[in-house]
């Protein structure tokens, strides 16, 4: 009995590895967020007496004392305490994570928030700045269009709001699929009845014939794909000009 080899798909291993790496990154971000929150709580829990002791210790070391009068220092401490009291509930409602050297506050988004505003806030890299909420009932402003309805041109730049449609794949009324080529007809090699039939071909001969046929089929698919891409040449030209202007 021959031994049976179990082949493990490489894609499953890569998927499991990527999933483990993602879990590790999320766990690290969660732990770091807890540490940052504890540090903020410790800073918010400091009393004015701690600040006064710090001022006394600085004066004892011989450094220049603060030029403020006692009533000014008391006023400043009172303002700091009021700011901490007002900012306490706001800080407790923040959930800042850092991913690839950029931070975003996820507490400002709900479960139904689309991914685009979250990515936009992450790219801004300013967790303290909250994303402006757009009312779902407010209609979007209409896009300015010219006579053709494809683009708007001003004196400085060319703003494109709509790409031109692709050219038709074939003549009007012809329902053909431009991406799928026509099937290649099999080669029938028949022999007259009076001639003796050829012996059965060997496996290597069959493989060679099939390889030659599949090469022609693959070439037909490449040509069909190239013809289909040419239908979008105008759109590609506009996108290329937009990319080169950046």
UniProtKB/Swiss-Prot annotation:
Residues 37-55 have a biased composition (Basic and acidic residues). GO terms for cellular component: Myb complex; nucleoplasm; transcription repressor complex. Residues 163-172 have a biased composition (Pro residues). One of its GO terms (molecular function) is protein-containing complex binding. The modification Phosphothreonine is found at residue 167. The lineage of its organism: Eukaryota, Metazoa, Chordata, Craniata, Vertebrata. Component of the DREAM complex (also named LINC complex) at least composed of E2F4, E2F5, LIN9, LIN37, LIN52, LIN54, MYBL1, MYBL2, RBL1, RBL2, RBBP4, TFDP1 and TFDP2. The complex exists in quiescent cells where it represses cell cycle-dependent genes. It dissociates in S phase when LIN9, LIN37, LIN52 and LIN54 form a subcomplex that binds to MYBL2. InterPro entries: LIN37. Transmembrane segments: none annotated. There is a cross-link at residues 5, 7 (Glycyl lysine isopeptide (Lys-Gly) (interchain with G-Cter in SUMO2)). Pfam families: LIN37. Keywords: Acetylation, Isopeptide bond, Phosphoprotein, Ubl conjugation. The keyword Acetylation applies. This is Protein lin-37 homolog. The modification N-acetylmethionine is found at residue 1. The gene is LIN37.
């Amino acid at each position: 009995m021959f031994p049976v080899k179990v082949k493990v798909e490489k894609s499953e291993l890569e998927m499991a590895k990527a999933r483990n790496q993602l879990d590790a990154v999320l766990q690290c971000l969660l732990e770091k967020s807890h540490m940052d929150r504890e540090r903020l709580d410790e800073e918010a829990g400091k009393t004015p007496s701690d600040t006064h002791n710090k001022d006394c210790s600085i004066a004892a070391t011989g450094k220049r004392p603060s030029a403020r009068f006692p009533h000014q220092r008391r006023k400043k401490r009172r303002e700091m305490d009021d700011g901490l009291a007002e900012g306490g509930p706001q800080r407790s409602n923040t959930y800042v994570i850092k991913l690839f050297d950029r931070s975003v506050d996820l507490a400002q988004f709900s479960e139904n928030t689309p991914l685009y505003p979250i990515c936009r806030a992450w790219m801004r890299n300013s967790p303290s700045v909250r994303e402006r909420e757009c009312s779902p009932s407010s209609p979007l402003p209409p896009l300015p269009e010219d006579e053709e309805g494809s683009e708007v041109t001003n004196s400085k730049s060319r703003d494109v709001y709509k790409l031109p449609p692709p050219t038709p794949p074939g003549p009007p009324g012809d329902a053909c699929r431009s991406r799928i080529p026509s099937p290649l007809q099999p080669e029938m090699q028949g022999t007259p009845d009076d001639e003796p039939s050829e012996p059965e071909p060997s496996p290597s001969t069959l493989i060679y014939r099939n390889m030659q046929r599949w090469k022609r089929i693959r070439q037909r698919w490449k040509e069909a794909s190239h013809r289909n891409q040419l239908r979008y040449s105008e759109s590609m030209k506009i996108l290329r000009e937009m990319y080169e202007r950046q």
